[in-house]
C-alpha cells in the first residue's frame, strides 16, 4: 500500500508539532513547507532524526516550493500572522487573506484533490478564503476550531469536577472567538448531563458559567501567560485528530468549521461555521443536532459575527 502524504503549510510552532505528531501516529510521509529559507529544511531534518529513536520509518522533507505539495492526501494550513499590538482587525484580515490566496493557488495547482484543514486565524473567514482561492469542493475543506475549543471545555470541566477528562464529553459550536457556544445541554460527564449535575448540586451554576466564559477566552489566556506566541500543542493535536479521521476513514463526529448549507441551524445562506461534523474518507458532512432555545439564540449571535467577518473580507477583496 502506498504511503499517505501529508503537507503542512507553515513550519512554525503548530506546523512543527503537527509534523511530529503525524510521525508518531505513523500517518504518512510529511512535507513541511514555509517561505522562510532553510527553516522548514532544518526542522524536517531534526524531525527525521527522531524516527530511529521513536521506531518509525517515514520520510520528512522541508521545502520552500509549492511543487513539493504535489499529490498530497492531506494539507494542513497554519501559515499566516498573529494579531499584534496596534494591528486592527482589518489589518490582520488583509494580511492573512493574501496569505490564503497564495496558499490556495499552491493547492489548486499541485494537490487539488487533497483534504484541506485550515488552522489560520481568524479561522472561520480564513477557511472560507482558502476555499475561494483553492477551488477545493465543500466536502474536502474544513477549519479546525471546535475540536480545540471543546478540548478546553472538557479540560476545565474535568478539573472542576475532579474526574478523568476521558469521562467528559463536551461540545462547542459557532465561530472560533468570543461568540462561540459551549453546549451545556448535550455535554455530559459519564452520561450525566451538566444540567443534571447542577440540579444535584455537584456543579454550581456560577462555576459552570465561569467555565463557559473561560472556554471562550481559552486562547487569550494562553497568549497572556506566554507573552510571546500562542497555543500550539493542543491546536496541533486537534488538527491531527481530524486528519487521522479522514486518512483512516474513522467517521468521527467532531466540532469543526465546515461549509453548512442554508436551512441547517436556521442559516439563510451557506456558511463556514463550527458545527458537529462527520469526517470520513469521503470528506466532511455537517450534522444538525438538537440544541436548546438559548443555545440557538447564542448560535445566531455567533453566526452573525462570522457574517460580519465575511463582509469585512469582501470589502478588502473589493479594494
UniProtKB/Swiss-Prot annotation:
Keyword NAD: yes
Pfam families (UniProt xref): Ldh_1_C, Ldh_1_N
Binding site for NAD(+): 10-15, 34, 96, 119-121
Family that this chain belongs to: Belongs to the LDH/MDH superfamily. MDH type 3 family.
Protein name as annotated: Malate dehydrogenase
Amino-acid positions noted as binding substrate in the UniProt annotation, renumbered to this chain: 83, 89, 121, 152
Signal peptide: none
Keyword Oxidoreductase: yes
Keywords: NAD, Oxidoreductase, Tricarboxylic acid cycle
